[in-house]
């Protein structure tokens, strides 16, 4: 497909928005899902201050703005701001006219019906798209790994889901949601670094901690043993240079932070860890398909990028599952963007072209058409 008629693929996450053209192997635009508004009235006349900023620009001006995330825990909660993010995506990032391209959007598993209708309505009425489709994020990740059956553990910035999928269809009764993801881990790292005597409190400093987390954290195969190693030697210590030139040292925090994924009690949460949630999700499925799910457990999303996470999942699920069961954890290197990549694959398939909801169908049926055509 040429760019001039290529479908647009937009994956709206709680933390980052990924956008680009169907058929590409990576998103062209990746920016924070943030809308910022000035805290104070502009002092300098003629500076041409805008009433709102989106993405990286909002991030860089964060000291004078109030930042809002329109997507909370994977679900859109502020539609005015969401519209601003889409506008920014089309006109500033991709530089396309949305009325000339079909648009594939992604949604969280178990997204409320009213939300899908609202997305559909905004695309056709505000942006005048010729056609659109809404796909479930985890299903796209599975497609990106070249499968149609498996269980996806998708963990991003705002929310974690375990989604069993059989022959391309998500099984809603067995989907589980865990409100523990990247943002919570960043907050936890801020807290445990404070215990070491480093103070990180502001939203600007939170971004620094997020960078420390992404560069230095990893998942221990055996937490207790790793703690013992960290206590007895400095072999696990790493240093990090802050923007002001100060150098900080971080030791057991490197694996204590992501350990919260397996032990949510670290964050004061009573829920099960990601390994147990994945197991519970499999157990909610028909006994005949469990074997296929165990053998096709796919990790996706930025919060699954920690080194060591796949080995640890393998170990934990093996301990929970029947002893003869073959368990395979698939962690593709590009899993940070696998939702987007799956969307790019889907939207460029010739067999998918009849699946689009067209403007004409929308005009005839209204927003509820989305439930009949996207499942």
Swiss-Prot record:
Keywords, ordered alphabetically: Acetylation, ATP-binding, Cytoplasm, Cytoskeleton, Hydrolase, Methylation, Nucleotide-binding, Nucleus, Oxidation, Ubl conjugation
Stretch forming the signal peptide: none
Main location: cytoplasm
Modified-residue entries (N6-methyllysine), positions: 84
GO-annotated cellular components: actin cytoskeleton; cytoskeleton; dense body; focal adhesion; nucleus; plasma membrane; protein-containing complex
E.C. number(s) listed in UniProt: 3.6.4.-
EC class: hydrolase
Modification sites for Methionine (R)-sulfoxide: 44, 47
Further details from the record: In vertebrates 3 main groups of actin isoforms, alpha, beta and gamma have been identified. The alpha actins are found in muscle tissues and are a major constituent of the contractile apparatus. The beta and gamma actins coexist in most cell types as components of the cytoskeleton and as mediators of internal cell motility.
Stated name of the protein: Actin, cytoplasmic 1
Lineage: Eukaryota, Metazoa, Chordata, Craniata, Vertebrata
């Amino acid at each position: 497909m040429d760019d001039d008629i290529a479908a647009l693929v937009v994956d709206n996450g709680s933390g980052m928005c990924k956008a680009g053209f169907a058929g590409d192997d990576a998103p062209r635009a990746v920016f924070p899902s943030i809308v910022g508004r000035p805290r104070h009235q502009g002092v300098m006349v003629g500076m041409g201050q805008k009433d709102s900023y989106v993405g990286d620009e909002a991030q860089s001006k964060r000291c004078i703005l109030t930042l809002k995330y329109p997507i909370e825990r994977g679900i859109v909660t502020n539609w005015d701001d969401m519209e601003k993010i889409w506008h920014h995506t089309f006109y500033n990032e991709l530089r396309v006219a949305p009325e000339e391209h079909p648009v594939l959007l992604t949604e969280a598993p178990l997204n409320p019906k009213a939300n899908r209708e609202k997305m559909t309505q905004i695309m056709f009425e505000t942006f005048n798209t010729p056609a659109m489709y809404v796909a479930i994020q985890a299903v796209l990740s599975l497609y990106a790994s070249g499968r149609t059956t498996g269980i996806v553990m998708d963990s991003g910035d705002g929310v974690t889901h375990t989604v069993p999928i059989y022959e391309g269809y998500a099984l809603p009764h067995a989907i589980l949601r865990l409100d523990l993801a990247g943002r919570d881990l960043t907050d936890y790292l801020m807290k445990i670094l404070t215990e070491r005597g480093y103070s990180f409190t502001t939203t600007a400093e939170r971004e620094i901690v997020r960078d420390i987390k992404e560069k230095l954290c990893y998942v221990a195969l055996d937490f207790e043993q790793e703690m013992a190693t960290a206590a007895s030697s400095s072999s696990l210590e790493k240093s990090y240079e802050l923007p002001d030139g100060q150098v900080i040292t971080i030791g057991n925090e490197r694996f204590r932070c992501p350990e919260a994924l397996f032990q949510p009690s670290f964050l004061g949460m009573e829920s099960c860890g990601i390994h147990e949630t994945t197991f519970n999700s499999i157990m909610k499925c028909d006994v005949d398909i469990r074997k296929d799910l165990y053998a096709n457990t796919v990790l996706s999303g930025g919060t699954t990028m920690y080194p060591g996470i796949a080995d640890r999942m393998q170990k934990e699920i093996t301990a929970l599952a029947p002893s003869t069961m073959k368990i395979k954890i698939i962690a593709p290197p590009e899993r940070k963007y696998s939702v987007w990549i799956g969307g790019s694959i889907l939207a460029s398939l010739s067999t998918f072209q009849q699946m689009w909801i067209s403007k004409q169908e929308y005009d005839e049926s209204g927003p509820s058409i989305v439930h009949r055509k996207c499942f």
